Amino acid sequence: MEIKRVAVVGAGDMGHGIAQLFAVGGYDVILMDKYPEMLDKAKVRIEASLQRWVERGKVTGDQAKAALSRIRYTKDMGEAVSKADLVVEAVPESVELKMSVLKEASELAPRDAIIASNTSNIRISELAKAAVRPERVVGMHFFNPPTAMKLVEVIPGESTDPSVVETTAEVSERIGRTPIRLLKDSPAFIANRINAAETLFFDLVLEKGIATPPEVDSFAKSQGMPMGPYELFDFVGIDIPWDSLKYLSQALSPEYGKAATLRKMVEEKKLGKKTGRGFYDWSTGRANIPEVPPTDKISLMDLLAIDINEAVKLIEEGVARPDDVEKAVVLGGNRPFGPISVAKDLSNAEVKAKLEELATRFDCKIFAPTRAITEGKMRDAIEGRLSPAADGPA
């Protein structure tokens, strides 16, 4: 089917950026939010963003004006979706809220409209249960900020029509994004599945008293990272990684719920930059990070082994192909390389030994070597020769 009209539901950080991308791509867009103040703020932010694009030469002044003319704003769901070919849900990451939006949108949209969710973690098959036509529901996971990040993960639910996946991927390309098609639905998809294991690791480093946030962030920067993990948690909001781990503790493994430090900080409303305090003091608008030597209690190999383990899980579960896992991690995390290319330079034995050490040290099954690595088949997995496990998560 041909996509001409796009409705974006939710005018927050993700929604307004997604609307901008579609408008610049030549689509007629309606941005919907039930809160008028959110729509007013979104309009200002889109105009400012397009002005920056003009200044950087990404679009001409005329192209920016044309894009703005293609965006309409409404607080009425019916007005937004009644003539839409594609509806993109971009409301906050709550199962109940997203299911409510998908139910209403699918009831009011044309029968053949594609209903896409921008969820970052929630299984599409779970969300699609709320829709009138589950076969028209697909995951379309943009990364933040969508105007800068090129990756879009395209996720089929158990009932999704293959043509819906294909059309969603084609539309992603037309707005200048790089779509990665998952082979099947799985919690947190690719990039965030790998990020979640890293997040759990950094929480447990604090739980075990191994190092402090400044020491770990100093270590991260010594390894060439622009921002350490705790500064990043503060910057995006500590509730974001915690919500992800909380969902995965229910959908994938209770082990993700071991992130007690993140949970406590969310309970105490110490969310980072947006509340003024998290792992660091943000009262001046930027993190006040004490200068300390890097910790030597963790290593780059710890993180590489964890990433490789999660990548191999995705492959053996039949969620994604090795090349797509690599590309998703590189594009989704702005990294110079991904776990597949790293694994090619390491032996199965050294990765297995490191994972066994981490699983014991942190008393965490997430870090235990996955089946393929335990059986010495890491190379088969990363080179695409591994048959997916029949009983893997879906």
Where are the language model's segments positioned?
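N-terminal glycine-rich phosphate-binding loop for ADP-containing cofactors
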Residues: M1-A394
